[in-house]
């Protein structure tokens, strides 16, 4: 039977519960255990797919097409285990299922309540799909005391009572703030956080204390005394310069051994060679390469979390520090671009939606193309690159994307159901219309995803929930989600990078390149080096006459890992390093 580990947080949010859960999973893996990591989010959205990136951060897409929390990216990057739709759940998804079942009469007329009905669905999610794993680590989003999180805490309390300590462990992450006037780390917020957790009925077995400096033995003893925890089970979590130093820091504190001791499991040696290799490369990274990221969502860099990490992975590969220059595309003009992109070694335009900030992005793309600066366009960045090429290189001055709903020559068009030759199925029907406060208006329409090899296997899991909040009359409104195969053209930059002619990458887009313009683009030097299996969707474009200019329709950042950097990011950083040396 799998053992369950619940990671909760207190005092403040964004303490690093996801990194802690991912680090522990990796450390247990290093001892030979099989681990699954899951995220339970208390918000009422069905999934993050329609949430403002400024507010939520990036939407992390799994192979099977689930739009999930960015913490699943940490889980994948640290453990190397591919996440799936069964690894993330929200309050919105839970209530969607609950209300649907109630309307269908599945509750046989009884009064439907938070306890036991909501908590039962949460428990079903946690306890399902556990075969083949030694440990299930569940991160509870938010902080203890949040109203929206109470059903989740109640559910894991019930699981703890049922499984007892032999099979269930609670880890609580708190903050020890440093007060400069007294030059002391304060333990009182941690004491109150544990008090709040115990009032719910959960007594933490391990306390992980986040601090900006070393924690004294007297502070640890004080925390242990007032929180009723043995001092050896109070684990310091000192701020690190790089998140990939965190797992080894936890290892040096004995976190995974404390977990195994709690479960009375014999200790075995850890195999951490690849992580020590990463740490060595990070510490040996003395040179820098400067990359400009041309962004729309400038209030939170978490909107581009996987892109940041993928760049860092390539930097680790070459023992280079990645110096990121964040450029708000709305403030970029023809007049100031030379000043803003001074001494840049590479330009990256990541994915996004909507018309806002596109002018600045296209100015940056033109600047990269005309100055022969290494360029990498991802998803929407690739689409804008084709529009820029059409307008300024080919001469199609009115080139536009259908997404903007303005008159012009549609270089980018909406995907239709026949654009993909693999079998597709409706994943979700959570159709809603939402307007971001400072964003674009978006239609969240019928979502399609390809059926993967294991999609036909019977699952006892009740989630993800199929909901219906609208009329799915317009079947052409599609979102191409998840991993799809892509065929590469031999002797191209892409084929050289991948060292293969068949790849599989994750997607999240509604629009694609209009194939009617392929010939005229090729006449002007554009190489189409990647296609979907039936060649209906262009996946990769290149300008081989330039130093390094590539746009991809997919999201390669989702598959990059610190010990296995993505080949396209490796080649992009290589080109940037060479450009830096030449200039």
From Swiss-Prot:
Keyword hit for Transmembrane helix: no
Binding site for Mg(2+): 71, 139
Top-level enzyme category: ligase
Keyword set, alphabetical order: ATP-binding, Glutamine amidotransferase, Ligase, Magnesium, Metal-binding, Nucleotide-binding, Pyrimidine biosynthesis
Pathway this chain belongs to: Pyrimidine metabolism; CTP biosynthesis via de novo pathway; CTP from UDP: step 2/2
EC number: 6.3.4.2
Residues bound to UTP: 13, 186-191, 222
Single GO biological process annotation from the record: pyrimidine nucleobase biosynthetic process
Binding site for CTP: 13, 146-148, 186-191, 222
Reaction(s) the record says it catalyses: UTP + L-glutamine + ATP + H2O = CTP + L-glutamate + ADP + phosphate + 2 H(+); L-glutamine + H2O = L-glutamate + NH4(+); UTP + NH4(+) + ATP = CTP + ADP + phosphate + 2 H(+)
Annotated GO CC locations: cytoophidium; cytoplasm
Binding site for L-glutamine: 352, 380-383, 403, 510
The organism's place on the tree of life at top rank: Bacteria
Domain Glutamine amidotransferase type-1 as annotated: residue spans: 291-582
GO molecular function, one term: glutaminase activity
Record bears the keyword ATP-binding: yes
Renumbered residue ranges of the record's region Amidoligase domain: 1-265
Gene3D superfamilies per UniProt: 3.40.50.880, P-loop containing nucleotide triphosphate hydrolases
Catalytic-site annotation from UniProt: 379, 555, 557
Role, per record: Catalyzes the ATP-dependent amination of UTP to CTP with either L-glutamine or ammonia as the source of nitrogen. Regulates intracellular CTP levels through interactions with the four ribonucleotide triphosphates.
Subunit text: Homotetramer.
Family in the record: Belongs to the CTP synthase family.
Additional comment: CTPSs have evolved a hybrid strategy for distinguishing between UTP and CTP. The overlapping regions of the product feedback inhibitory and substrate sites recognize a common feature in both compounds, the triphosphate moiety. To differentiate isosteric substrate and product pyrimidine rings, an additional pocket far from the expected kinase/ligase catalytic site, specifically recognizes the cytosine and ribose portions of the product inhibitor.
Protein name listed in UniProt: CTP synthase
Organism: Rickettsia typhi (strain ATCC VR-144 / Wilmington)
Organism phylogeny: Bacteria, Pseudomonadati, Pseudomonadota, Alphaproteobacteria, Rickettsiales
